[in-house]
């Protein structure tokens, strides 16, 4: 993962963790957990691509990697919808900026994962 994407993940996670969204803090914690999981998955997929020919290693580590890939895309779509929803309902400019940046990052990561997966297929 390039350093800009890495720092974007870290920045957004830090700022989201500081937010207090009232009764929905449990939902926010779930979003933070999914962001972290997505970051780890994206990193591992990127490493496999960097070691081109490592498809067999990836398949042996996770025989159902295509199913996992599909699940990750579903998680990304859910996160995108959740972030869009939060963006619509919040009036706090700090939260709006954070969620706009989170949305942009999700779209970038979705594209990167698509690119990596096509290289591995």
Curated annotation (Swiss-Prot):
- Protein's UniProt keywords contain Transport: yes
Q: What is its main location?
A: virion
Q: Where in the cell is it found?
A: Virion; Host nucleus
Is Plastid one of the keywords UniProt gives this record? no
Instruction: List, in alphabetical order, the GO biological process terms annotated in this UniProt record.
Output: exit of virus from host cell nucleus through nuclear pore
Motif Nuclear export signal in this chain: 12-21, 85-94
Query: Would you say which domain of life the source belongs to?
Result: Viruses
A cellular component term from Gene Ontology for this protein is: host cell nucleus
Sorted keywords for this record are: Host nucleus, Host-virus interaction, Transport, Virion
Residue ranges spanning the membrane: these are none
- Provide the assembly information: Interacts with protein M1. May interact with host nucleoporin RAB/HRB and exportin XPO1/CRM1.
The role this protein plays is: Mediates the nuclear export of encapsidated genomic RNAs (ribonucleoproteins, RNPs). Acts as an adapter between viral RNPs complexes and the nuclear export machinery of the cell. Possesses no intrinsic RNA-binding activity, but includes a C-terminal M1-binding domain. This domain is believed to allow recognition of RNPs bound to the protein M1.
Q: Which family would the database say this protein is a member of? A: Belongs to the influenza viruses NEP family.
Name of the protein in question: Nuclear export protein
Q: Which organism is it from?
A: Influenza A virus (strain A/Herring gull/DE/677/1988 H2N8)
Q: The organism's lineage? A: Viruses, Riboviria, Orthornavirae, Negarnaviricota, Polyploviricotina
State the encoding gene.
Answer: NS
């Amino acid at each position: 993962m390039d350093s800009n994407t890495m720092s974007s993940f870290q920045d957004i996670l830090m700022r989201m963790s500081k937010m207090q969204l009232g009764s929905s803090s449990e939902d926010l914690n779930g979003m933070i957990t999914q962001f972290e999981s997505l970051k780890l998955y994206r990193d591992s997929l990127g490493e496999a691509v960097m070691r081109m020919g490592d498809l067999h290693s990836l398949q042996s580590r996770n025989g159902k990697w295509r199913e996992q890939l599909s699940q990750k895309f579903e998680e990304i779509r859910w996160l995108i919808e959740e972030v869009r929803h939060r963006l619509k309902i919040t009036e706090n400019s700090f939260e709006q900026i954070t969620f706009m940046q989170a949305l942009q990052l999700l779209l970038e990561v979705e594209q990167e994962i698509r690119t990596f997966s096509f290289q591995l297929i």
